[in-house]
């Protein structure tokens, strides 16, 4: 689970340093020292520099001619990435020290940490990770030097790495995989760890760098877990053991990160799904296929019903499409050319057989649909269309099926069966910009209604190896999306090559309560599907024209959105979404009947309310319903019954005693009807107490 990078106190995570000059024949480190910049010990210590071409360089780098460089501090994204990469090398050295038979895979920095893959005889245990951390701390304390060395040839590299089969494979790598830090530069290089006193080589690794100067410049790190992983992420390859860790510019930053990890674990929707009886993943059904329990079903229904209402108000028309279709549809759309790996295998049906079992008439391949868009194209094409009907906005809660590898399936956020709140808008080119503007506003407003308000945008452009249509069409679509994104006043971040095969997209990136970023809504502009499906409308001048198609999923999928909201609210859903909105808790059994009357009054207003009639003591009932995240707990004892009142109890342990029944009912109904996303507390709920 990803948690946000935390800048050191006083730092914003950016690099405020001004460029400095490195004279020819001088190390970057010397220039840093001459400029009076910190080299170690501080969160803003300089770890590498960026040259005029944007390439990161070690501090030992010596330019042939005078060069202008930008110092990169430890508390920047690039600085942390270098520290983590160097820490991954220290991990690999520790593994080969303690497990000499271990073979090295790859060890890149990743968001908030790093990993390294190893071929070992047995999986790593928690005790192994402790021993490795201890050895790593020794290596850091030794202050080993990172020394860059250029191989004279690939043959020399293969010879030196003969006992490292995975590294030998990388010598000839041309994949451009960003996780492969070993190769990819202009030269084939190794980084040796040197004894700081004797400068003897202690250990080394095939690597393009850059690295920090010495292991002593690794301020704080921790190993977090281990798991199995296929070599290069391909399940056809060998299964290796992967160790994950994290490293930061200071102990304080590491401690903050660990606290966030622990809080993320407490909020894990998979854990809360069990504790709150929301959903499950039965083995009998299969990996990545969720079933929603009654309480989860209520939350899901509320999410969908509110979305339906807002789509109706925005002029969408509701459609439905089947779950399977003939293969030809996905040949037409291009999915079988460009997306087959993400689809389940075909089912051959409708074959006819002779009495002897031989095939008289071959069947046809049918596929579970991975997307709804081809079927919506057929709905548009089902009859003649006029410009007067455009924009035509089609909407469906359509369940699709995608073959996700078992290693990436994760709770509700990465599943194999998912229900998309899928819309496809068909419009004229003249309507395109206005439609995109209003669509983006609609998306942001609806997400805000669910309590998600911290956004930025990402513009995904053409993958040059995986697209349909002409370069000119892609360029026009990309420019239009960029223009609309820029007008939104939100940050627009480029994502080169990240588009689907049929068109560029803007995705809305949302930050949750922990500051983690989730890709949420996508808006995709498509000139290609209308061409492939022969979609036309009659224009005002009587000519036949192609519509523009806009693909849009607001939640991404209901399942994923459900999981994200569960973690955002730590299971304490806003009262309007909560499966149980209020619960009556009697002080004693003789108060049950009175609370039943209160509950009946709330139910008449549509409130989901229960009365706890269990044999548990009142204190235990309060603990139980607090843990179940019920927004409103209503207590009643003798004084409450006599006064026709209740006492409010909230999850933060605040309490309002002696609230007249009518006032209590009105306060709850008002809170829910206003769709308040805040958790109700004694301070927030405005109600007059009778005491």
UniProtKB/Swiss-Prot annotation:
PROSITE patterns xrefs: AA_TRNA_LIGASE_II, TGS
* Record's catalysed reaction(s): tRNA(Thr) + L-threonine + ATP = L-threonyl-tRNA(Thr) + AMP + diphosphate + H(+)
- Tell me the segments the record calls region Disordered: 1-22
A single GO CC term for this protein reads: cytoplasm
Q: What cofactor requirement does the entry state? A: Zn(2+)
Domain (TGS) spans 1-73
Matches recorded under SUPFAM superfamilies: Class II aaRS ABD-related, Class II aaRS and biotin synthetases, ThrRS/AlaRS common domain
Keyword Protein biosynthesis appears in the UniProt entry: yes
Q: InterPro entries given for it?
A: aa-tRNA-synt_IIb (IPR002314), aa-tRNA-synth_II (IPR006195), aa-tRNA-synth_II/BPL/LPL (IPR045864), Anticodon-bd (IPR004154), Anticodon-bd_dom_sf (IPR036621), TGS (IPR004095), Thr-tRNA-ligase_IIa (IPR002320), Thr/Ala-tRNA-synth_IIc_edit (IPR018163)
What does the UniProt entry say about where the protein is found? Cytoplasm
Under Pfam families, the record lists:
HGTP_anticodon (PF03129), tRNA-synt_2b (PF00587), tRNA_SAD (PF07973)
Keyword presence, Zinc: yes
- Binding of Zn(2+) occurs at 373, 424, 551
- Stated EC number for the protein is 6.1.1.3
Regarding protein family, the annotation reads: Belongs to the class-II aminoacyl-tRNA synthetase family.
What role is this protein assigned?
Catalyzes the attachment of threonine to tRNA(Thr) in a two-step reaction: L-threonine is first activated by ATP to form Thr-AMP and then transferred to the acceptor end of tRNA(Thr). Also edits incorrectly charged L-seryl-tRNA(Thr).
The annotated subunit structure for this chain is: Homodimer.
Q: Which NCBIfam families match?
A: thrS
Name of the protein in its database record: Threonine--tRNA ligase
Q: What is the lineage of its organism?
A: Bacteria, Bacillati, Actinomycetota, Actinomycetes, Mycobacteriales
The gene behind this protein is: thrS
């Amino acid at each position: 689970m990803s948690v946000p990078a935390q800048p050191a106190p006083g730092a914003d995570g950016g690099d405020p340093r001004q460029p400095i000059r490195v004279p020819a024949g001088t190390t970057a480190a010397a220039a840093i020292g001459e400029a009076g910049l910190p080299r170690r010990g501080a969160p803003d210590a300089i770890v590498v520099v960026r040259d005029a071409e944007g390439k990161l360089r070690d501090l030992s780098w010596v330019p042939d001619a005078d060069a202008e460089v930008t110092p990169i501090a430890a508390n920047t994204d690039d600085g942390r990435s270098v520290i983590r990469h160097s820490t991954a090398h220290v991990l690999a050295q520790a593994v080969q020290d303690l497990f000499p038979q271990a073979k090295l895979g790859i060890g890149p920095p990743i968001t908030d940490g790093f990993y390294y893959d190893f071929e070992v005889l047995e999986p790593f245990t928690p005790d192994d990770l402790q021993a490795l951390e201890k050895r790593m701390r020794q290596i850091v304390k030794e202050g080993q030097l990172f020394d860059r060395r250029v191989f004279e040839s690939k043959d020399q590299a293969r010879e030196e790495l003969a006992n490292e089969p995975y590294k030998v494979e990388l010598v000839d790598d041309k994949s451009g995989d960003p996780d492969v830090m070993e190769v990819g530069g202009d030269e084939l290089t190794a980084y040796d760890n040197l004894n700081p006193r004797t400068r003897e080589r202690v250990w080394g690794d095939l690597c393009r760098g850059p690295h920090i100067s010495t292991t002593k410049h690794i301020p704080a790190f921790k190993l977090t877990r281990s798991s199995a992983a296929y070599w290069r992420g391909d399940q056809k390859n060998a299964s290796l053991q992967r160790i994950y860790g994290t490293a930061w510019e200071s102990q304080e930053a590491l401690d903050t990160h660990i606290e966030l990890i622990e809080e993320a674990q407490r909020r894990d929707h998979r854990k809360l799904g069990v504790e709150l009886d929301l959903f499950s993943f039965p083995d009998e059904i299969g990996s990545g296929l969720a079933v929603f329990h009654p309480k989860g079903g209520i939350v899901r229904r509320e999410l969908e019903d509110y979305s339906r209402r807002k789509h109706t108000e925005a002029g969408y028309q509701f459609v439905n499409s089947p779950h399977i279709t003939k293969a030809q549809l996905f040949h037409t759309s291009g999915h079988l050319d460009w997306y087959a790996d993400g689809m389940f295998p075909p089912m051959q049906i409708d074959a006819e057989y002779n009495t002897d079992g031989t095939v008289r008439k071959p069947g046809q391949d049918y596929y579970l649909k991975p997307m709804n868009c081809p079927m919506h194209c057929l709905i548009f094409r089902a009859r003649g269309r006029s410009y007067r009907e455009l924009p035509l906005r089609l909407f469906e809660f359509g369940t699709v099926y995608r073959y996700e590898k078992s290693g990436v399936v994760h709770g509700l956020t990465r599943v194999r069966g998912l229900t998309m709140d899928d819309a496809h808008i068909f419009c004229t080119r003249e309507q395109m910009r206005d439609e995109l503007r209003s669509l983006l506003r609609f998306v942001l407003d609806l997400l805000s209604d669910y309590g998600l308000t911290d956004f930025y945008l990402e513009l995904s452009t053409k993958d040059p190896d995986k697209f349909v249509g002409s370069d000119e069409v892609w360029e026009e679509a990309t420019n239009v999306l960029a223009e609309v994104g820029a007008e939104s006043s939100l940050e627009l971040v480029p994502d080169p090559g990240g588009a689907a095969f049929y068109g560029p997209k803007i995705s809305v990136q949302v930050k949750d309560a922990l500051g983690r970023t989730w890709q949420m809504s996508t808006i995709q502009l498509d000139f290609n599907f209308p061409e492939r499906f022969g979609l036309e409308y009659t224009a005002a001048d009587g000519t036949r024209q192609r519509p523009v198609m806009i693909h849009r999923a607001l939640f991404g999928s209901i399942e994923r959105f459900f999981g994200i909201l569960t973690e955002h609210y730590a299971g304490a859903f806003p009262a309007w979404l909560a499966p149980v909105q209020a619960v009556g808790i009697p002080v004693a059994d003789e108060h049950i009947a009175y609370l039943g009357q209160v509950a009946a009054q709330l139910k008449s207003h549509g409130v989901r309310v229960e009365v706890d009639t269990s044999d548990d003591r009142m204190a235990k009932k309060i603990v139980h319903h607090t843990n179940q995240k019920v927004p409103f707990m209503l207590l009643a004892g003798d004084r409450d019954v006599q006064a026709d009142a209740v006492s409010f109890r909230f999850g933060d342990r605040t309490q309002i005693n002696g609230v007249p029944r009518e006032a209590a009912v009105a306060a709850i109904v008002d809170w829910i009807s206003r769709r308040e996303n805040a958790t109700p507390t004694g301070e927030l709920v405005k109600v007059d107490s009778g005491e």
